[in-house]
Amino acid sequence: MPKQKTHRGAAKRFKKTGSGKLKRSHAYTSHLFANKSTKAKRKLRKAGVVSAGDFKRIRQMLDNLK
Protein backbone atom coordinates (compact mmCIF):
# COMPACT_ATOMS: atom_id res chain seq x y z
CA MET A 1 0.00 0.00 0.00
CA PRO A 2 1.59 3.34 -1.00
CA LYS A 3 1.89 6.22 1.40
CA GLN A 4 -0.91 8.77 1.46
CA LYS A 5 0.34 12.09 0.19
CA THR A 6 -0.70 15.61 1.12
CA HIS A 7 -2.55 17.41 -1.69
CA ARG A 8 -0.01 20.14 -2.49
CA GLY A 9 -2.56 22.51 -4.03
CA ALA A 10 -4.66 22.39 -0.86
CA ALA A 11 -1.57 22.72 1.35
CA LYS A 12 -0.77 26.06 -0.30
CA ARG A 13 -4.30 27.39 0.21
CA PHE A 14 -5.16 26.31 3.77
CA LYS A 15 -3.43 26.64 7.15
CA LYS A 16 -4.34 24.90 10.38
CA THR A 17 -5.11 27.08 13.40
CA GLY A 18 -4.16 26.20 16.97
CA SER A 19 -7.66 24.93 17.70
CA GLY A 20 -7.65 22.65 14.65
CA LYS A 21 -9.80 24.76 12.33
CA LEU A 22 -8.66 25.60 8.80
CA LYS A 23 -7.93 29.16 7.71
CA ARG A 24 -8.49 30.21 4.10
CA SER A 25 -8.14 33.39 2.09
CA HIS A 26 -11.05 35.08 0.34
CA ALA A 27 -11.70 35.05 -3.39
CA TYR A 28 -12.03 38.26 -5.48
CA THR A 29 -8.78 39.78 -4.20
CA SER A 30 -6.47 39.73 -7.22
CA HIS A 31 -7.72 42.61 -9.38
CA LEU A 32 -10.67 44.89 -10.31
CA PHE A 33 -10.52 46.82 -7.03
CA ALA A 34 -11.86 50.05 -8.54
CA ASN A 35 -15.34 48.50 -8.67
CA LYS A 36 -15.29 47.43 -5.01
CA SER A 37 -16.13 49.66 -2.08
CA THR A 38 -13.58 50.37 0.64
CA LYS A 39 -15.68 48.35 3.07
CA ALA A 40 -15.77 45.34 0.73
CA LYS A 41 -12.00 45.45 0.21
CA ARG A 42 -11.42 45.69 3.96
CA LYS A 43 -13.64 42.66 4.64
CA LEU A 44 -11.74 40.62 2.03
CA ARG A 45 -8.41 41.21 3.80
CA LYS A 46 -9.33 39.20 6.88
CA ALA A 47 -8.85 35.42 6.60
CA GLY A 48 -11.93 33.23 6.66
CA VAL A 49 -12.51 29.84 8.26
CA VAL A 50 -13.46 26.74 6.26
CA SER A 51 -17.14 25.89 6.71
CA ALA A 52 -18.24 22.68 8.40
CA GLY A 53 -19.56 21.25 5.13
CA ASP A 54 -16.17 21.52 3.40
CA PHE A 55 -13.99 20.73 6.41
CA LYS A 56 -14.11 16.92 6.17
CA ARG A 57 -13.14 16.84 2.49
CA ILE A 58 -10.29 19.33 2.90
CA ARG A 59 -9.02 17.57 6.03
CA GLN A 60 -8.63 14.37 3.99
CA MET A 61 -6.48 16.23 1.46
CA LEU A 62 -4.33 17.66 4.27
CA ASP A 63 -4.19 14.46 6.33
CA ASN A 64 -0.40 14.46 6.77
CA LEU A 65 -0.04 18.21 7.30
CA LYS A 66 1.20 19.18 10.75
Swiss-Prot record:
Entry's Gene Ontology cellular component terms: cytosolic large ribosomal subunit
Gene Ontology biological process terms, A to Z: translation
Keywords: Ribonucleoprotein, Ribosomal protein
Family matches, as InterPro entries: Ribosomal_bL35, Ribosomal_bL35-like, Ribosomal_bL35_CS, Ribosomal_bL35_sf
PROSITE patterns: RIBOSOMAL_L35
SUPFAM superfamilies membership: L35p-like (SSF143034)
UniProt-recorded Gene Ontology molecular function terms: structural constituent of ribosome
Region (Disordered): 1-26
UniProt similarity note: Belongs to the bacterial ribosomal protein bL35 family.
UniProt xrefs under NCBIfam families: rpmI_bact (TIGR00001)
Protein name, per record: Large ribosomal subunit protein bL35
